[in-house]
Swiss-Prot record:
Converts phosphatidylinositol 3,4,5-trisphosphate (PtdIns 3,4,5-P3) to PtdIns 3-P and prevents the transition of PtdIns 3-P to PtdIns 3,5-P2. It is one of the known effectors injected by Salmonella into the host cell and is required for invasion and for an efficient generation and maintenance of Salmonella-containing vacuole (SVC). Alteration of the phosphoinositide composition of the plasma membrane causes membrane ruffling and actin cytoskeleton rearrangements. This is Inositol phosphate phosphatase SopB. Its EC number is 3.1.3.-. It comes from the Bacteria. The keyword Hydrolase applies. Keywords: Hydrolase, Secreted, Virulence. Contains the consensus sequence Cys-X(5)-Arg characteristic of Mg-independent phosphatases. It is an enzyme of class 3 (hydrolase). Belongs to the phosphatase IpgD/SopB family.
Length: 561
């Protein structure tokens, strides 16, 4: 079928959308014959935004009159390439419109990166919608479906194909090093697929080098976006772990309509988080594999907005809390299957004890107050577990923290200070406002968990944006503590030295790379500009550098679920 004949049969709206896409052709270039698949990946782009400012510098007359965006052309190119691959999966590699688009992209590819134009940005943002419209038009042609039904089918088909593409790509360890004041810190993000004792990953349903992306929202077998995150420092000729925790997506498979399957799925995901938590404690894992029943303390910090006014995160929080409650009844022993060093499944016995928090950290929670009351009903119980029943700031800590301090450990002062800070935040409801530090309570809960030898775990809905920012805030404070031997006051903006640490962490924590296997594009949606300005969180002030803020934001604003 020729492209022109397709336009005669497609809707006017679809015609106009694809005419706009085809304007990316460069004049005088011929379209090469191709197989309708996406072109090769663009060369890697530098992490910083590059803007030419020298009088003689130019990208050609075409770009001289174009407004540039803050997005790398290579990143946009690779996003469009991945979307075309999904389209080819649904429509087949011989589709003439896909062939045309792929060839145009190949011709337009440039070796040197540059900021994209606003027109290129708009084309990238519209591509997914246009591909779904193309699939719908093809479905109408072939099956005679009504337009609305064809569009619904197309959206589901594209989503399923995209999930499979993202899940089936290699999920690999991300490791970056940063240097500050002569100290070398290594940030490591280890995906579930690489949590191994032997040649295979430890999970009974093996990941086989792959993963479960944040968009796979009906998956009832695996946790979404499950990683172990660590930061270590090289001292005295060896690496010392400063922090280790587990990050993941919400436990609720929230697009599963059957309530029983949704609950089973949430519990399966929770078991995988517990398995990952056990893996993060090698000595405890070895005891469990030797047949000993082991106790495992975990501090779970949800970052969702516990309200259904916008979205359904309130229901997701309920599903997650129900899963933790089901697995952690007092005195309950649970059996997990773990693949040992020989690759055989082995049953281990653990007694899990979970302090389950939820702390809203987005604009809906901190600027509009959504979900705060519901979250605090969970948080009060979890604080009793962690700190004892007397939550007055001046009271001696009880609970897990009291048990730890009774041993007079080397980190006594750090633990005592974190406990006091958390109590102050709770007493004054500081976690209900941005106050210059959106993650003030969540970040300190995770740090305190690590300091008392419990396992910190944290998650938002997807396990990438809010979860990634929490990861960066933890590592910022951990490195700052290692450098200054002092903890930051709650609700304080970083000073210039703290901003330098934060900037380095944001660019070298592995979080931007973690977003790519989940969505096909690197970037964090926490970085946004809302109108009116009063709705914005304090991240521009916390980061202190517009270029780095934009770099961390990446192409997240162009990606739609």
């Amino acid at each position: 079928m020729q492209i022109q004949s397709f336009y005669h049969s497609a809707s006017l709206k679809t015609q106009e959308a694809f005419k706009s896409l085809q304007k990316t052709l460069y004049n005088g270039m011929q379209i090469l014959s191709g197989q309708g698949k996406a072109p090769a990946k663009a060369p890697d782009a530098r992490p910083e935004i590059i803007v030419l400012r020298e009088p003689g510098a130019t990208w050609g007359n075409y770009l001289q009159h174009q407004k540039t965006s803050n997005h790398s052309l290579h990143n946009l190119y690779n996003l469009r390439r991945d979307l075309l691959t999904v389209g080819a999966t649904v429509l087949g590699k011989q589709d003439p419109v896909l062939t045309s688009m792929a060839n145009q992209m190949e011709l337009a590819k440039v070796k040197a990166d540059r900021p994209a134009t606003k027109q290129e940005e708009a084309a990238a943002k519209a591509l997914k919608k246009n591909l779904i419209e193309l699939i719908a038009a093809r479905t109408q042609q072939q099956d005679g479906l009504p337009a609305k039904e064809a569009h619904r089918f197309a959206a589901v088909a594209f989503r399923d194909a995209q999930d499979k593409q993202l899940n089936n790509q290699p999920w690999q360890t991300i490791k970056n090093t940063l240097t500050h004041n002569g100290h070398h810190y290594t940030n490591t993000q280890l995906p579930a697929a690489e949590m191994k004792i032997g040649a295979k990953d430890i999970f009974p349903s093996a990941y086989e080098g792959k993963g479960v992306c944040s968009w796979d929202t009906k998956n009832i077998h695996h946790a979404n976006n499950l990683w172990m995150s660590t930061v270590s420092v090289h001292e005295d000729g060896k690496d010392k772990t400063l922090f280790c925790g587990i990050r993941h997506g919400v436990l609720s498979p929230y697009h599963e309509k059957d309530p029983l399957l949704r609950q089973v799925g949430a519990e399966n995901k929770a078991k995988e988080v517990l398995t990952a938590a056990l893996f993060s404690k090698p000595e405890l894992l070895n005891k469990a594999l030797a047949g000993e029943a082991v106790s495992l303390k975990l501090v779970s910090v949800g970052l969702l907005t516990a309200s259904n006014i916008f979205g359904k995160e309130g229901t997701m929080v309920e599903d997650q809390m129900r899963a933790w409650q089901s697995l952690t009844q007092p005195g309950k022993m649970i059996h997990l299957k773990i693949r040992n060093k020989d690759g055989d499944l082995q049953t281990v016995k653990i007694k899990p004890d979970v302090a389950a928090f939820n702390v809203g950290v987005n604009e809906l929670a901190l600027k509009l107050g959504f979900g705060l009351k519901a979250s605090d009903s969970y948080n009060a119980e979890a604080l009793y577990q962690l700190l004892g029943n007397d939550l007055r700031p001046e009271a001696r800590p009880g609970g897990w923290v009291g048990e730890w301090l009774a041993q007079y450990p080397d980190n006594y002062e750090v633990v005592n200070t974190l406990a006091r800070q958390i109590k102050d935040i709770w007493k004054n409801n500081q976690h209900h406002k941005d106050g210059g530090e959106p993650y003030k309570l969540a970040q300190r809960l995770a740090m305190l968990a690590h300091e008392i030898d419990a396992v910190p775990a944290w998650n938002c809905k997807s396990g990438k944006d809010r979860t990634g920012m929490m990861d960066s805030e933890i590592k910022r404070e951990i490195i700052s503590l290692h450098q200054t031997h002092m903890l930051s006051a709650p609700g304080s903006l970083p000073d210039s030295g703290g901003q330098k640490i934060f900037q380095k962490v944001l660019l070298n924590s592995g979080n931007p790379g973690d977003s790519e296997p989940n969505t096909g594009g690197a970037g964090n949606k926490v970085m946004k500009n809302l109108s009116p300005e009063v709705l914005n969180l304090s991240y521009q002030k916390r980061v202190g550098d517009e270029n780095i803020w934009q770099s961390v934001k990446g192409i997240s604003s162009l990606i739609t679920s």
